[in-house]
Amino acid sequence: MSFHRIVCLTEETVETLYLLGQDHRIVGVTGYAIRPARVRREKPRVGAFTSADLEKIKALNPDLVLTFSDLQADIAAGLIRAGIEVHAFNHRDVAGILRMIRTLGALLGCIDQAGALIAGYEARI
C-alpha cells in the first residue's frame, strides 16, 4: 500500500519525510515541527505532542498518521477507532532513529533515499 496523505505527530518524522523528498505527502504536522523552517508556513498544525486535535486530523483525510510510543497512545487509539491507519515509532536511541528512517522508506516506497540518508548519518557517527 502506498500512503499519500500523512499526518506527522512527531517532529522527527516531519523532518525525515522532508529529507527523503516526501514532504508532498504531508497534510498535517505537530505544532512542534520547526525543521525545516519552511514547514511552519507549508503545513497545517494539528495539535501539540500529547494533545492532538482528532477532528482536525480527521478533516485532513489522512491515510496514515505517524505517532510516537506510548506517549501518544490515547491519540493513536482515537484515530484507530476512527478507521485511520496509525504507525507508532518507539525510537529512543540512534539505532532506533535509523530503524525509523528505514521503516519510513519501506512504507513510502523510497527505500533507496532512506538508505542514502542512513548511510550519511552513519558516516558522521
PLM region spans:
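N-terminal ligand-binding lobe of clamshell/alpha-beta domains
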Residues: 1-125
